[in-house]
A protein has these predicted regions:
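A cross-kingdom signal targeting lumenal/periplasmic-facing segments of multi-pass membrane
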Residues: 122-140, 145
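N-terminal secretory signal peptides that target proteins for export/translocation
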Residues: 1-2
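Long, charge-dense tracts
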Residues: 104-126, 158
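Hydrophobic membrane-insertion alpha-helices, especially the h-region
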Residues: 5-25
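Long amphipathic alpha-helical segments
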Residues: 417-426
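Primarily the internal scaffold of c-type cytochrome electron-transfer domains
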Residues: 23-106, 142-286, 290-418
């Protein structure tokens, strides 16, 4: 066999592996400085300063300032109130701050600005709320450890000089990917995972998962905790909460049903992990921060947005169907999830109302009422584990639809149990 034939055989035999490695790992971890300039001063946190060394990355990061609806009609980067399309939110979160202000998220550069403007923030709000809102969090944690979590939020605004930006995901000293959220590191350690030994591909999801995840505040210290000890599924996290970890039992008491409720927070990482992309080793950044080329230079886009805004770069590196077909496929999945999500949310809202009416009946069976409250607590948790996500279920459609179906079933059980308690039909 000639040398040329041997070379061709090697290329054919290993081509897929080489291609995937090139597409997904080529440039994201160690960005090259502009025109070979020296690296910035170690410890620099200002994205504008770092942007002078990485102009293409910074230019794309600036696109996160744009506000526009999603190409699929779901999500988007305009901070419109969700209750305008989902009025059931006002019932389901009655008695807690999300009934006052629950909007779609704008881009990362707005993180501090939107936190300050949120109607959920009051003079009593604590520093734990800053954990995923500033690039300064690793410095704050280094100086104060978890003590910052119980500080007044207003004080931390003085130390949080930059919104979510470079230093949340890159070590300012080495520019390598790193996780800055201590809650994520602690959760992974409890799961037996050493983040310091993570692969490049894993890190490209970990830097996103450190904030796009469910969490709660430890009652005494206000430390941020991720409820992953039993797993990432809604059922597993619910079982974890049932054990009242660190004394945590509930986020609030619903004023209608008197159920002890939980509020889910953007569990995107958990949902992605069990989906086809997560199980296939496709990282968050592969789709949401694709590799681009400009003036002959490859760089990673830092416009963290829907892959449907740049289908060619985000999707067609793996998928060979046309852009229109891919967009319609995503729309179809999201439409199915949206319809079932609305049914679940409205059924949960009705359950709260029925339990409240049943409890007002003088001779209502208290034991049955408690069963109904537990059912609506769990039904709403399952609904919220989908409703609180970004992506309208696309990260794991099978799991999401199953979760919503179970939510609807439990909400109907809650209604039936409440009616049984009151020996009537509301």
């Amino acid at each position: 066999m000639t040398a040329r034939k041997i070379l061709i055989s090697l290329i054919v035999g290993t081509g897929a592996t080489v291609l995937v490695a090139f597409i997904f790992q080529g440039v994201i971890d160690e960005p090259a400085t502009a025109e070979g300039l020296v690296k910035p001063t170690a410890g620099e946190y200002d994205p504008a300063v770092l942007g002078t060394y990485f102009p293409q990355q910074y230019k794309s990061y600036q696109k996160n300032l744009e506000m526009a609806p999603s190409p699929t009609g779901f999500g988007g980067s305009e901070n419109v109130q969700k209750s305008l399309k989902e009025p059931e939110i006002l019932t389901n979160f009655k008695g807690m701050p999300f009934s006052k202000d629950y909007s779609e998220d704008r881009g990362h550069p707005y993180s501090l600005q939107d936190l300050k403007a949120s109607k959920r923030v009051t003079p009593a709000s604590l520093g734990a709320c800053m954990t995923c809102k500033t690039a300064s969090i690793s410095n704050i944690y280094r100086e104060k450890r978890w003590g910052y979590a119980s500080m007044p939020l207003a004080e931390l605004f003085l130390e949080a000089k930059h919104p979510i930006s470079c230093a949340n995901c890159h070590d300012p000293a080495t520019l390598k990917l790193r996780v800055g959220n201590p809650a994520f590191l602690e959760a992974m350690q409890r799961r037996g995972i050493d983040v310091d030994k993570a692969s490049r591909s894993d890190m490209r999801s970990y830097v996103c998962g450190q904030c796009h995840a469910e969490y709660f505040f430890e009652p005494k210290t206000k430390r941020v905790v991720f409820p992953w000890d039993k797993g990432y599924l809604a059922e597993q996290m619910y079982a974890y909460y049932a054990e009242k970890p660190f004394g945590f039992e509930q986020d609030w008491n619903h004023p209608d049903s008197q159920a002890k409720m939980l509020k889910a927070q953007h569990p995107d990482f958990e949902t992605w992990a069990g989906g086809v992309h997560g199980r296939s080793g496709v990282a968050c950044a592969d789709c949401h921060m694709p590799s681009l080329s400009e003036s002959g230079r490859n760089y990673t886009s830092h416009w963290i947005t829907s892959p449907m805004r740049q289908v060619q770069a985000s999707c067609k590196t793996c998928h060979k169907q046309g852009e229109d077909w891919l967009l319609e496929r995503v729309k179809a999945v999201q439409n199915n999830v949206w319809q079932l999500q609305q049914t679940a949310g409205k059924t949960v809202a009705r359950a709260h109302e029925v339990i409240g009416k049943a409890a007002a009946v003088e001779k209502a069976d208290k034991a049955e009422l408690e069963k109904a409250r537990e059912l609506v607590r769990k039904a709403q948790w399952f609904w919220d584990m989908v409703a609180a996500q970004n992506g309208m279920g696309f990260h794991n459609p099978d799991q999401v639809l199953n979760t919503l179906g179970r939510s609807i079933d439990m909400a109907h059980q809650a209604i039936a149990t409440a009616n049984k308690a009151a020996t009537t039909h509301f």
